[in-house]
Structures are given as structure tokens and as C-alpha cells.
């Protein structure tokens, strides 16, 4: 089973590390090409491109300038411990054992605008480069054209290494658009998380993001490898809704909190 999640805009390079082990990202040659393009952007251009404040644009211009492999624990941090958004709140990797990290390293992948695909223990320097932005490059007008089939190829390599053929898509639409589903060597499963509000069930962004992290945690902690095992997901009040699930879309509902 291969679990795919999105990165986060918020980063944490301060908290104590849950593990000292690390690996290097596998697509750094591609990342270098993007950094070269980004270094030519002024803070004003970065602000406009990313829709962020002048202060954040200045910070990210500095990050592009400081970026340099080879990464070390002194200048970088493991991806799973560096990202800090709602998904990662649900994942809560801070209490992972070394065995948990071993399983995650094999079965979890984070998509990234700059790094393409990250394994949990891959070191990364801080950055902001969302997959959906329009960044001119040699391959086209955006990062989807830049990455092409590279991301799908890496995901297939991971599937081949683990000998499984189940892919759990817990990434956002913006990020999963970088994957070519027809070329994935596995059955694609998409969990959907619905929360009750005023008597109606719907996707509530904050809760849905956290739930993606919770399901990732559930898979890692319980060493899941089969599609059927996902139906037992029950963290924080969610339960499988067979009646509303269709094909490879698995619906999980939670009553109003």
C-alpha cells in the first residue's frame, strides 16, 4: 500500500526530532533546475506569483538563495517532521517509533512542487513552491509540465519495491494533478471525509485535511497493506459509510462535534 499526501505551507524547523535517521531526496537534479529559475525572480515577482505578502516573498527569495544540496541535519530536516499543516497535525509523527518510520519510509510519499516526491526521512531545506503556480520553465508554463511523468515514475518504483498494488490518494486535487493515474501500477483508492454540520454531511476543509493525516497515521501505526483494512478506520469519530461509497471512493462520516 502506497499512501500519497500533500506537503504543507507551514514548516517547523525548531521542535525536537523524533528520529536522527535521514535520507536524501531522489529528484534533486530536478529541484536544482527549479531553484535556478526561482533565483531569477525578484521578491515582487515572487509575491505576485504566489499570492503572498511582501514579507513572505522576501523570506522565500532568501530561501531560494540559501538553498544548496547536499543536505545535512544542520541545514535541513526530515520532510515528515518539517511539514506542519493540518494533515501533519493528524499524522502526528512526533511520537513515531523507529519501526513506524521504517514502515512510513516504504509506504508514504509526499508530493512537492520543488522536490517532486519526498519520502518521510528525506531531508529538505525550507521552501515554498506550490504545485499549482504558473512558473515558466523549459518544459512549459507550470510545474505540472515541468514534472511530467517523473512523479508517477517514482511512485511506481515505490510500489514495485514494496510489492503492493494499492495506492491511497490522500493528497489535494492541486497536488494529485501532478500524478498520471492511468500510468500508475496500482489500484487507486480515494477516501472522502464528510463531517456533519446543521444536520447535513459535507466536506469541511479543515477537518478533511486533518482526517487525511489521521488515516495516514492509522495505516502506518497498524501496518495496513490491504484495501479492506481501510474500512476499519475509526479515529476521532469517523466511520466507514458503505451506502455512500462507490467503487474506489471510500466515504467516511463523522457526526457533528
Curated annotation (Swiss-Prot):
<dbReference type="GO" id="GO:0033194">
    <property type="term" value="P:response to hydroperoxide"/>
</dbReference>
<dbReference type="InterPro" id="IPR005583">
    <property type="entry name" value="YaaA"/>
</dbReference>
<dbReference type="GO" id="GO:0005829">
    <property type="term" value="C:cytosol"/>
</dbReference>
<protein>
    <recommendedName>
        <fullName>UPF0246 protein Spro_0686</fullName>
    </recommendedName>
</protein>
<comment type="similarity">
    <text>Belongs to the UPF0246 family.</text>
</comment>
<dbReference type="Pfam" id="PF03883">
    <property type="entry name" value="H2O2_YaaD"/>
</dbReference>
Amino acid at each position: 500500500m502506497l499512501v500519497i499526501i500533500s506537503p504543507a505551507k507551514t514548516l517547523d524547523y525548531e521542535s525536537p526530532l523524533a528520529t536522527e535517521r535521514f535520507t536524501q531526496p531522489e529528484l534533486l537534479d530536478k529541484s536544482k533546475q527549479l531553484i535556478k529559475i526561482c533565483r531569477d525572480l525578484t521578491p515582487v515577482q515572487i509575491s505576485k506569483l504566489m499570492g503572498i505578502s511582501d514579507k513572505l516573498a522576501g523570506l522565500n527569495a532568501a530561501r531560494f538563495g540559501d538553498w544548496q544540496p547536499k543536505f545535512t541535519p544542520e541545514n535541513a530536516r526530515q520532510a515528515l517532521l518539517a511539514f506542519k499543516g493540518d494533515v501533519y497535525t493528524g499524522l502526528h509523527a512526533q511520537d513515531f517509533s523507529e519501526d513506524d518510520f521504517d514502515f512510513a519510509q516504504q509506504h508514504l510519499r509526499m508530493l512537492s512542487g520543488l522536490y517532486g516526491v519526498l519520502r518521510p526521512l528525506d531531508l529538505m531545506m525550507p521552501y515554498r513552491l506550490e504545485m499549482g503556480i504558473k512558473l515558466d520553465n523549459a518544459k512549459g508554463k507550470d510545474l505540472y509540465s515541468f514534472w511530467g511523468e517523473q512523479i508517477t515514475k517514482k511512485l511506481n518504483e515505490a510500489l514495485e519495491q514494496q510489492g503492493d498494488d494499492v495506492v491511497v490518494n490522500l493528497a489535494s486535487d492541486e497536488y494529485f494533478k501532478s500524478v498520471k493515474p492511468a500510468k500508475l501500477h496500482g489500484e487507486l483508492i480515494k477516501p472522502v471525509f464528510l463531517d456533519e454540520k446543521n444536520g447535513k454531511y459535507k466536506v469541511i476543509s479543515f477537518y478533511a485535511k486533518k482526517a487525511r493525516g489521521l488515516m495516514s497515521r492509522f495505516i502506518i501505526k497498524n501496518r495496513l497493506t490491504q484495501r479492506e483494512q481501510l474500512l476499519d478506520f475509526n479515529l476521532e469519530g469517523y466511520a466507514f459509510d458503505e451506502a455512500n461509497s462507490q467503487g474506489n471512493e471510500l466515504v467516511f462520516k463523522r457526526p457533528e462535534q
